[in-house]
Amino acid sequence: RGRNITWFVGDESSPMALRHYYRGGLIGKLVTDKYWFSGLKNTRAYREYQLLIELEKRQLPACRVVAANVVKSGLSYRADLLMKMVEGGQDLVALLTKSPMSDELWQEIGKTLAIFHKNDVYHADLNAHNILMNKDNKAWLIDFDRGEIRQQRGQWCQDNLDRLLRSFNKELNQLPQFYFEQDNWKTLMAAYNAELAIN
């Protein structure tokens, strides 16, 4: 089981995703979905909710949040987040197991990542599962748990990109079919750097 689990709810006219917060790592095997409560504003759901509201204000391509739910029990809490689904959204792993992506799509991803970084947005788990292409072939980022707006760009931007590249290489090594080549990464980075150069 991953760190978070998502259910798809709503109807065709208003599809939404409901994500329950689960712990990952070793502690997640002992305490699956309980977190220490030290105030509402410190909860994972509240912080992600506030971040997604800010990203929407900045018109960045991230999931539009609908509601957050925090249930306190003694000294701990459980939490959920309800978001609108990205119309026609498919993550990069799903896409790349089917067929190669065009240079234009790789450029779109690179440009989008640069726009988030120009807005000082830190994504704590940037990987191929957390980037979606929508029905119009526009890139969206999802899962901003533990993300934040930082004071300025720095080494964390490169760390984000390094994490994403490791994710592509991990899928390439683990999946029987995954259409990713180093030239794809070069195309992504060229678009990323070109966007960063624009004031």
Q: Where do the model's predicted regions map?
A:
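A short beta-strand motif that forms the metal-chelation/ATP-contact edge
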Residues: 79-84, 138-144
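Conserved alphaE helix
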Residues: 104-112
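C-lobe/activation-segment region of protein kinase-like
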Residues: 139-199
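Conserved ATP-binding subdomain of kinase catalytic cores across diverse folds
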Residues: 1-90, 114-118
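AlphaC helix of the protein kinase catalytic domain
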Residues: 91-100
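Conserved catalytic-loop position in the HRD/HxD motif
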Residues: 120, 125, 143
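Hydrophobic residue at the +6 position relative to the catalytic HRD Asp in the kinase catalytic loop
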Residues: 126-133
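Short, glycine/acidic-enriched loop or turn micro-motifs at the edges of active sites
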Residues: 87, 128, 146
